[in-house]
């Protein structure tokens, strides 16, 4: 089972990963938690380049191909072996992030992005993609608070420094994908409390994947809100 989590900056998706994995584990699903970019040794170096605000002059194509390189290594080293071993993979961002950040927001053609996906990812597709929908104003306010509280670091804040219009294009890009692939996407309202969002996630997984996760415990929730 392959589950991906997507959303704008500050949508709270990262906060939900640990309780989700704990819930899966309690129900007999051995889960591997991973993320993009930066899930491998090579990927961590690519992540540092991509998210460094000092790299504001990075070209859109450079950004696109760096994400593709990170994903190629990630698939080879983490995702494909885990799925092959029968494990559940829970991934914080995947191909949809490229489609909306580099496509809808940056303006790179869908044709080029699709070509890169076909080379790097081939026919692998998540069983379920959970989209944490949130307005950019609220999301960016959360990220500012996280930076102030030391829960995020300034050396990974390049995307947080983009304009509000950029983040709105990201949000609308995600919603367009969800509308086009309703069988794959589960859209959750990220404005709710962490407990409300978690409950919505688990009930959605049960409904969409035909499984029965039980034993939901609000104590699983990390009190911090991240993107």
From Swiss-Prot:
Its domain of life reads Bacteria
The reactions it catalyses are: dTMP + ATP = dTDP + ADP
Q: What is its EC number?
A: 2.7.4.9
- The residues listed in the UniProt record as binding ATP, with positions renumbered to this chain, are 7-14
Q: Is Kinase one of the keywords?
A: yes
Q: Pfam families from the xrefs?
A: Thymidylate_kin
Example GO BP: dTDP biosynthetic process
| A GO molecular-function descriptor | ATP binding
Asked whether the keyword Transferase is assigned, the reply is yes
Q: Kindly list the GO CC terms recorded for this protein.
A: cytosol
InterPro entries in UniProt: P-loop_NTPase, Thymidylate_kin-like_dom, Thymidylate_kinase
- Alphabetically list the UniProt keywords: ATP-binding, Kinase, Nucleotide biosynthesis, Nucleotide-binding, Transferase
Identify which top EC class this enzyme belongs to.
Answer: transferase
What family classification does the UniProt entry report for this protein? Belongs to the thymidylate kinase family.
Q: What does this protein do?
A: Phosphorylation of dTMP to form dTDP in both de novo and salvage pathways of dTTP synthesis.
Tell me the protein's name: Thymidylate kinase
Give the source species. Desulforapulum autotrophicum (strain ATCC 43914 / DSM 3382 / VKM B-1955 / HRM2) (Desulfobacterium autotrophicum)
């Amino acid at each position: 089972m392959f589950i991906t989590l997507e959303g704008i900056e500050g949508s709270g998706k990262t906060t939900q990963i640990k309780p989700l994995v704990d819930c899966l584990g309690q129900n007999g699903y051995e889960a591997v938690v991973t993320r993009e970019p930066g899930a491998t040794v090579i990927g961590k170096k690519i992540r540092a380049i991509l998210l460094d605000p000092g790299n504001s002059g990075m070209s859109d194509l450079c950004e696109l191909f760096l994400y593709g390189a990170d994903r190629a290594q990630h698939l080879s080293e983490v995702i494909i072996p885990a799925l092959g071993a029968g494990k559940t993979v829970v991934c914080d961002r995947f191909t949809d992030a490229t489609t909306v950040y580099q496509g809808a927001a940056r303006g790179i053609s869908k044709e080029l992005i699709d070509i890169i996906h076909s080379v790097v990812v081939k026919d692998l597709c998540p069983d379920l993609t959970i989209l944490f929908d949130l307005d950019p104003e609220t999301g960016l306010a959360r990220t500012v608070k996280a930076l102030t509280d030391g829960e995020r670091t300034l050396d990974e804040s390049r995307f947080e420094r983009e304009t509000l219009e950029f983040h709105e294009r990201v949000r609308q890009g995600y919603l367009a994908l969800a509308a086009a692939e309703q069988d794959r996407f589960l859209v959750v309202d990220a404005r709710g409390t962490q407990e409300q969002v978690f409950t919505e996630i688990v009930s959605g997984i049960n409904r969409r994947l035909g499984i029965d996760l039980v034993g939901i415990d609000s104590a699983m929730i990390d009190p911090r809100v991240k993107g």
